[in-house]
Curated annotation (Swiss-Prot):
Belongs to the UPF0231 family. NCBIfam families: PRK05248.1-1 (NF003574), PRK05248.1-3 (NF003576). InterPro entries: UPF0231. This is UPF0231 protein YacL. Disulfide bonds: none annotated. The lineage of its organism: Bacteria, Pseudomonadati, Pseudomonadota, Gammaproteobacteria, Enterobacterales. The gene is yacL.
Length: 120
């Protein structure tokens, strides 16, 4: 999972993620927006979940982050998982609306994002 951090002309941090993980970048850009307290909450949840069967979720305005002890899923809130309503041959997975990655990989991006933001 590759990523890049940039600052736009106004100094706002933007995240770009590799193909298949774009939604994780959107989550940082739309939900985190340099809010390090939110990252603290996510890291605390990851520590609590490690080695357990529980899961944790944080719904935002545009995206929801879901996590268990092994995996992180970020999905657009407009994406509905209504299996009975799916048309035959249609797949709910849309790389513009859903990304999955391992918890450790995600936490590496969180730590790198925090470092980048604090470099002001």
């Amino acid at each position: 999972m590759d990523y890049e951090f940039l600052r736009d002309v106004t100094g706002v941090v933007k995240v770009r993620m590799s193909m298949g993980h774009e939604v994780i970048g959107h989550w940082f850009n739309e939900e985190v927006k340099e809010n390090l307290a939110l990252l603290d909450e996510v890291e605390d949840a990851a520590r609590t979940l490690k080695g357990s069967e529980r899961s944790w979720q944080r719904a935002g305005h545009e995206y929801t982050l879901w996590m268990d002890g092994e995996e992180v899923m970020v999905r657009a809130n407009q994406l509905e998982f209504a299996g009975d309503e799916m048309e035959e041959g249609m797949n709910y997975y849309d790389e513009e609306s859903l990304s999955l990655c391992g918890v450790e990989d995600f936490l590496q991006v969180v730590a790198a994002y925090r470092d980048f933001v604090q470099q002001k």
